[in-house]
Curated annotation (Swiss-Prot):
Positions contributing to 5-phospho-alpha-D-ribose 1-diphosphate binding: 81, 84-85, 89, 91-94, 109-117, 121
Domain of life: Bacteria
Role this protein plays: Catalyzes the transfer of the phosphoribosyl group of 5-phosphorylribose-1-pyrophosphate (PRPP) to anthranilate to yield N-(5'-phosphoribosyl)-anthranilate (PRA).
Cofactor(s) required for function per UniProt: Mg(2+)
Gene from which the chain derives: trpD
Protein name, UniProt field: Anthranilate phosphoribosyltransferase
Length: 338
């Protein structure tokens, strides 16, 4: 299918087949579509609503074209979300990655610089002194030896350069916001994925099932956060053993006080880094509580504990023992030596 035919199809609110979406994505990723065509297609898809088949097909193309990182073995997990929730919180999932690593997980943290927030995962890690642009072999060593490595999206998905200009010019959420957490170059089987709207909870769980994932928690909080929140109920769509179940959790279930997420907002990368460091140093705060919740979910997704509740307890334990901040220090040292 050529790009103009695809545009005519989606603007009449007809869905693309998996094969058609694959063809169109290959055209976009190879630079054969103009910025206007890319923007038009993304708007058309959003207006009609992207399907599980379309998203999975697009993700497969990006995975196939990505510069891959090869890691194997148990307890592999990623904590990448879609972003776009507008809350401007500090980097919760990034802080969580170090807690999960300290708990025995192996985290392939996929991320990028900020698109819609004050500070992306790449921004805060770079500010901490972590070198972002490593070879796939160096990243694999980080994960194997330290339990955590950062996969800087532009280094692995060079073909998305053709989409950057139209996405920035449009300034709205598109298919590519959904693709970030679906296209980890290490093909991680277990994930915690935060989404910007509850309409995507079960669909993204099924997309990840189609992509071969095994244990996934797709989360969205009632206060709008694309993380497990301390300010409201959080809905979770859990993929496990080929089935998806949906349920709600509250911070009180885990002995955590409910606090407005406005207390977690930041205005700069440095402010986000300061909070991340305080959390990893186990300073009591709402920030530490929300990291414990989200790290606990990833510990559970990585199959290190049999329940989410035990995952949160394990997260709090490694924080109290100072092991999470040791992982941050180790990653800084390792990457600076590369």
């Amino acid at each position: 299918m050529d790009i103009q035919t695809a545009l005519r199809t989606v603007t009449t609110r007809r869905n693309l087949t998996s094969e058609e979406m694959t063809s169109v994505m290959n055209l976009i990723m190879s630079g054969q579509a103009t910025p206007a065509q890319i923007g038009g297609l993304l708007i058309g898809l959003r207006m009609k609503g992207e399907t599980v088949e379309e998203i999975a097909a697009a993700a497969r193309v990006m995975r196939e074209l990505a510069t891959k990182v090869t890691v194997t073995g148990p307890h592999l997990v990623d904590t990448c979300g879609t972003g776009g929730d507008g809350a401007n919180t500090f980097n919760i999932s990034t802080a969580s990655a170090f807690v999960v690593a300290a708990a025995g997980g192996r985290v392939a943290k996929h991320g990028n610089r900020s698109v819609s927030s004050q500070c992306g995962s790449a921004d805060v890690l770079e500010a901490a002194g972590i070198k972002l642009e490593l070879t796939p072999e160096q990243i694999a060593r980080c994960i194997e030896e330290l339990g955590v490595g950062f996969l800087f999206a532009p280094c692995h998905h060079s073909a998305i350069k053709f989409t950057i200009a139209p996405r920035r010019e449009m300034g709205i959420r598109t298919l590519f916001n959904l693709l970030g957490p679906l296209t980890n170059p290490a093909h991680i089987p277990n994930q915690v994925v935060g989404v910007f709207s509850d309409e995507w909870l079960e669909p993204l769980a099924w997309v990840l099932h189609r992509l071969g994932c095994q244990h996934v928690l797709v989360v969205h909080a009632k206060d709008g956060l694309d993380e497990i929140s301390i300010g409201a109920e959080t809905q979770i769509a859990e993929l496990r053993d080929g089935a998806v179940t949906s349920y709600f959790i509250t911070p009180e279930q885990f002995g955590i006080e409910r606090v407005s997420i406005s207390s977690l907002a930041v205005n700069s990368t440095q402010e986000s880094l300061n909070i991340l460091r305080s959390v990893l140093a186990n300073q009591p705060s709402p920030a530490r509580d929300i990291v414990a919740l989200n790290a606990g979910a990833a510990i559970y997704a990585a199959n290190l504990t049999p329940t989410l509740e035990r995952g949160v307890k394990r997260a709090l334990k490694v924080l109290s023992e100072g092991r999470a901040q040791e992982k941050l220090a180790a990653l800084i040292t390792f990457t600076q030596a590369c």
